[in-house]
Amino acid sequence: MEAAITQRIQYPSWVDCRKVECKPQRGSLRYSQQVKVDRRFRGLSLARLQPERRNDQRRAVSPAVSCSDNNSSALLETGSVYPFDEDILKRKAEEVKPYLNGRSMYLVGMMGSGKTTVGKLMSKVLGYTFFDCDTLIEQAMNGTSVAEIFVHHGENFFRGKETDALKKLSSRYQVVVSTGGGAVIRPINWKYMHKGISIWLDVPLEALAHRIAAVGTDSRPLLHDESGDAYSVAFKRLSAIWDERGEAYTNANARVSLENIAAKRGYKNVSDLTPTEIAIEAFEQVLSFLEKEETMEIPDGDL
């Protein structure tokens, strides 16, 4: 389940884009050798394209966090973002879209990892339709919240509804789906998700615990019945959940590590990342997966 988390981040308005010339990228032929050639000449890497930020121009981060009641998304409200990053996101979507051939994408990850927010961004720039599994389940239950479903019907009942939702979505094309944190524990769910491309948002447990502690655990049915301070409760339970699910997340076709993105961009904390930056990396990882997939499918004699 995803709780709607709001993280307000202030950004400097100055960006010197005169040093960088950006041209829209176009999809190339779907042949592995051609892909390799195209990739060689796509210009500067994502990291090198970023305008240099001096220490005194680093974004100021406010810990202000709010939570909605419907648990349908982990929404990081970022306000304005760098137009430069928005351009990169659009260009990456244009680059990936021809290779997708209409295949859908499924975002997986721990609760609070931002699947809904990132998924909405990706679907928008691709022109795909977005669905949140938890929201679909709540609608099927006449508006009953996920937390209430757990209380009145139990987790197994909810997991069954989750599988039903994924089964229906798997027959559709050109959709981006935000799954619940526990969707990965049922092998049948992977069968449905692998009809598209699965993307794992890998967020450090400490960061997740801080997010959840800031909004409280009342809306998290799997974090109930614990005593202690909010962060300790969240981190302890998240660690236990990770022990149960961690290996299952590795079944995803693409992994988006927030720690890796932060390191590449010179941030000290993953909380400095914007959803746009995460979505850009997601497209990069999807493209990498698709290129490897093509190479495996094409006989050596055709290379």
From Swiss-Prot:
Pathway annotation: Metabolic intermediate biosynthesis; chorismate biosynthesis; chorismate from D-erythrose 4-phosphate and phosphoenolpyruvate: step 5/7
Cofactor note text: Binds 1 Mg(2+) ion per subunit.
Entry keywords, A to Z: Amino-acid biosynthesis, Aromatic amino acid biosynthesis, ATP-binding, Chloroplast, Disulfide bond, Kinase, Magnesium, Metal-binding, Nucleotide-binding, Plastid, Stress response, Transferase, Transit peptide
UniProt note: phenotype after gene disruption: No visible phenotype under normal growth conditions.
Cofactor(s) required for function per UniProt: Mg(2+)
Location(s) in or outside the cell: Plastid, Chloroplast
UniProt transit peptide range: 1-66
A Pfam family it matches: SKI
An individual GO BP term: amino acid biosynthetic process
Induction per the UniProt record: By heat stress.
First-listed, main subcellular location of the protein, grouped into a coarse class: plastid
Record HAMAP family: Shikimate_kinase
Protein name: Shikimate kinase 1, chloroplastic
Organism: Arabidopsis thaliana (Mouse-ear cress)
Source lineage: Eukaryota, Viridiplantae, Streptophyta, Embryophyta, Tracheophyta
